[in-house]
Amino acid sequence: MSRYSATEIEAKWQEAWDKAGIFRAARTADKPKYYVLEMFPYPSGRIHIGHVRNYTMGDVIARYKLSNGFNVLHPMGFDAFGMPAENAAMASGGHPKDWTYKNIETMVAQMKPLGFGLDWSRMFATCDPEYYGQQQALFLDFLEKGLVYRKNAVVNWDPVDMTVLANEQVEDGRGWRSGALVERRELTQWFFKISDMSGELLDALDTLDDWPAKVKLMQANWIGKSRGLQFSWALTEPAHGIEALDVYTTRPDTLMGASFLGISPDHPLTKALEAENPDLAAKVAEMRKGGTTEEAIEKAEKLGADTGLRVRHPLNPDWELPVWVANFILMDYGTGAIFACPAHDQRDLDFCRKYDLPVIDTFVALDDPKPIATEAFVPLKTEKVKWIDHFAGLDVATGQEAIDTTIDWMEAKGLGTGVTKFRLRDWGLSRQRYWGCPIPVVHCDACGVVPEKKENLPIRLPDDVTFDVPGNPLDRHPTWRDCACPSCGKPARRETDTMDTFVDSSWYFARFTAPRAETPTDMAEAEYWMNVDQYIGGIEHAILHLLYSRFFARAMHICGHLPEKSKEPFNALFTQGMVTHAIYKTTGADDRPVYHYPEAVRLEGGKGYLEDGTEVEIIPSAKMSKSKNNVVDPVAIIDRFGADTARWFVLSDSPPERDVEWTDAGAEAAHKHLNRVWNLCDRIAAMDSAAPGEGDDDLLREMHKCIRDVTNGIESFGFNASIAKLYAFTNTLAKSKAGAAAQKQAIMTLAQLMSPMTPHLAEDIWAHQGGEGLIAAAPWPVADEAMLVDALVTLPVQINGKRRAEISVPADMDKTQVEKLALSTDAVQKALDGAAPKKVIVVPGRIVNVVV
């Protein structure tokens, strides 16, 4: 072998894998299937080191399963629609399509040198008409089955991106991409009926045994099942034909602490009152400026307006309460109306203190009954409290006991009904932008909203659009909107809204099973390949993507595109940590931070210096950010060290669920180790096969232990633990005095065990040592159980708990034989002095204790 040149060997073996078609997947009856998938990337233009870590993890699993006799599907594609492409077009004067496909071309060229065992023949981008045409077909099927509908709704409007955002896309009251403060608007929108599946989506979480508990908890909280009471409050005087207001509450036990009745700014009564009261209308308009998400509403300043209306308390008709419009009340959760109990709800208390409304205790702490000041008393529902003249006769009880008792009492009196509700709301999918999947419906003056015919799909996006002004170019296009009604043939208008990009990623995993099919899926292929056996991606997708995908899988099953078993599409989920890097910062002349590239900083004695000697502040383990100049370019790493070094390091330094900090020193150490393995192979290849050796069994015993430990590590996603065992075995092999045959067996096994992590180096060692075929297709080594037992173990011998001797015995020696050997030692014989021991305790492989 010559000098280790990663560049030369990596290109050679990638070509060999392609030529052999090792990673091309096809149905077969003679192997079990295994589908491994990493969340596909957005084509931003360049891959980053986080991509390398994510896809290397998936590749380790895919290669390992392939070596274990599985028929592996490991595809790759691109989540390609979305605002960044439009923003780039606006900035450059180009076209989103050109920008996107150029970026895909660049990223594929960057990914292939990493040696991922991917079936590139299945690659697609969600902006391919062949893909989004099938997505349009799914939309029509969902529409036919009543899973999608259109209605007027108050939505989150991003005034910068000029589009609607789903609740999940609003973070801290701002658009998730633009960062703009979100506004409320009422628009006609398309919605998926995900709320109809709330109970099923929640209950099925219990079946996902191989999902992280944290992800399941996040989804459960988002779905938000609650049990409460729905009941009516009669208005003292009817208003606009409304005689009573229905309220849903999860804390009916606090009914006697009511301070006011609140209604949403979007409640029908609010809208009716606005029309006749300009002052109220102005105040409500101010309330509607924030977003519609619970988070945005919770963080917003509490705003309210007294309507002048009053209601009668359900338990005391003489007790009248004011009706207020409040900006923190959601129209589409519950009934859009609440009763406020400020003593036991911080939001209500803040509102009441601001508007000088009464605060009434309904219960107090058992040990320290304090009056309510600025902080509401909100104990856990499992905590016992002292009730104050509770109408259902409660004295001391937990919150949950009080809720259950109150619901039963109110139902018995005919005053209300116990109801189960969910927080999960229907998914608004309409977006007012160009670069997305067109919604396949037509608006006809004669027929109304008409679904497009499937034979006319895909409804393609027009190429001749401009982005010189904000808004949706489809609205301004001179001809694209115009079409014939599919029903009556008269002139009609296309829907100009496009689909939320989360639709695109909610079913791509199913499309990978038959990416060229002329229907959304080929059921035979879906029946064979689904479900995804191992899905890998970030925890940040716990609610959005993963919940939507679970809904889509169910909807596709209803429409005949997925089998029953695939209603839960991902059997196992792994959420990986990030790759971080230190930030190097100084302060500029204007007191603003200046961030420096890592290569511009000299590290010395734990400190960092610029070329001119200026010391920089080092912020360790920071999230990589282009704006902070701490992004690691994988292409530069591959050019310098090779793909195998990058793969090895991102797996070796931290458990995969945790963040790992990229350091040049760590990468250099990884490269040094791979060089060492290469040189070790050279040394073993040059050994005299006839020369005697010693310790063959010891070396092979350690080899089989390494097989066991590396296998267990990969099976449990403990890649760093597997690599630690490979380091240790490399050291053992380097020091071994065993004969050539044993060392050759050991180096070839080491190559096999390293092959999922460093596939190129492993292939070269395998070939150099005379391995048959490609290591990527070779069977995974199996540990010999007989070789996992150490030849001899040393056991301490205690007499009455004190160590007096030790014996060396075969590790698998019978307990009776161990006892006899221990009793024959001089120390035990002397202690017994001819008598029999009271007891002998043998702990196999650990210790012998003689009681005299």
Curated annotation (Swiss-Prot):
GO biological process: leucyl-tRNA aminoacylation
InterPro entries: aa-tRNA-synth_I_CS (IPR001412), aa-tRNA-synth_Ia (IPR002300), Leu-tRNA-ligase (IPR002302), Leu_tRNA-synth_edit (IPR025709), M/V/L/I-tRNA-synth_anticd-bd (IPR013155), Methionyl/Leucyl_tRNA_Synth (IPR015413), Rossmann-like_a/b/a_fold (IPR014729), tRNAsynth_Ia_anticodon-bd (IPR009080)
PROSITE patterns for the chain: AA_TRNA_LIGASE_I (PS00178)
Sequence motif 'HIGH' region, location on chain: 41-51
Enzyme class at the top of the EC tree: ligase
Annotated EC: 6.1.1.4
Signal peptide coordinates: none
Motif stretch ('KMSKS' region): 623-627
Descriptive protein name: Leucine--tRNA ligase
Provenance organism: Ruegeria pomeroyi (strain ATCC 700808 / DSM 15171 / DSS-3) (Silicibacter pomeroyi)
Native organism taxonomy: Bacteria, Pseudomonadati, Pseudomonadota, Alphaproteobacteria, Rhodobacterales
